[in-house]
Amino acid sequence: IEATLKLFETAFANKDNAYFHLLSGEDVVLQPFEVIEKQWQQRFDFQAMMTCERAPQYAYRFIMDSPHADSNWQRQLTGKIITKLQKAVAKVKPYHSPIYFGSQWFSVTRADWEKIMPFTDEYSDFFRHKLVPDEHFFQTLITEKLTNQIRLSNDNRRQIIFDKNVNNGNSPIYLDLLKLEQAKFNGYW
């Protein structure tokens, strides 16, 4: 989350930047930015291009801080045991607020980012020691603080595929040229 906020801070400093698209270093941009902006306006009326859904199955990530969050041992045996313990605790100790979940990769307008910025420190503090905060941070912030000000499209126009047979589905798979061409044809960005 810290890296994402730094990226946005740097991009926001340039007054000419009207649109912000968060991508991974391994992403492939499939459409020219002019096409992306035109589709974004025509099909989505510049709604925040972000996936967001309620996901109570991830309550274990919220009920307590995780000592192994964002550590080298999070996905090693010790970290996996701690995560299993947190899941057990979550079954006994319910989390009473909705859990919002979605992809970290999203697009927002400058106007929407201006609305998000005042809340980033507060939410950074909450998520600092939580598991997989990038899948919850912006969705939770917007839904809790800006639900009447920022409309979410629940679509980020990214072709992201998780395959349980590859690294247990923990990371998106790499797409071959055929899948990339098909994604472009299907209007993914």
What positions do the PLM features span?
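ER/Golgi luminal nucleotide-sugar-dependent glycosyltransferases, focusing on the catalytic module
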Residues: 1-189
